[in-house]
Amino acid sequence: PTRRSSDLEKTDADGYDAKEFDLTLGYSTGGFSVSITDYWYNTGAGYFHYGAHNTTHLYEAQVGYDFGPVAVNWYTNFAGDDGVKENGDRAYSSYISIAAPFKLGGLDWTAEVGATPWETDFYGASGFAVCDVSLGATKDIRITNSFSLPLFAKATWNPCSERAYFVVGLSF
């Protein structure tokens, strides 16, 4: 599970929905996991612009533990195009999620609830706010005996922003 970047209202200079490119480096052992993700949007400075005040990259750290029936993850934006507090200070926008996986109809499902613990305009929250209630499914689509594509789909409702999203993709 990762942060719901689809919850962000991003448009390019012409007002079209922004394109997003995410790179994640992670490690897990047993139930413990840790990762760093670079989220990039085509909403301003080009891909190779990493300046403190002219980047559209966002860097996020994750730490979590999968207890079996429930997984708990904490995410914090630590650099890049993060949100701010009302006073203008960097918010170090953070997010905690609790996810419960289950199997149904030949698919792997996950029900998830997530919240931001403090004020940040990144998530549009003035304090603690539930910003993710979601249901997702994954299925490996077999192409050959030795190769399959891991397809996922997820429906998300954000009570804080009163918006809903549907995401489909592939995981590698």
Question: What does each of the following model-derived ranges do?
Answer:
Residues 108-143:
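Outer membrane beta-barrel transmembrane domains
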Residues 8-12, 28, 37-41, 75-79, ...:
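Outer-membrane beta-barrel pore domains and translocons
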Residues 40-93:
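Hydrophobic, well-structured mid-protein blocks that either form specific transmembrane helices
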Residues 26-30, 64-70, 99-105, 138-144, ...:
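Structural signature of outer-membrane beta-barrel channels/translocons
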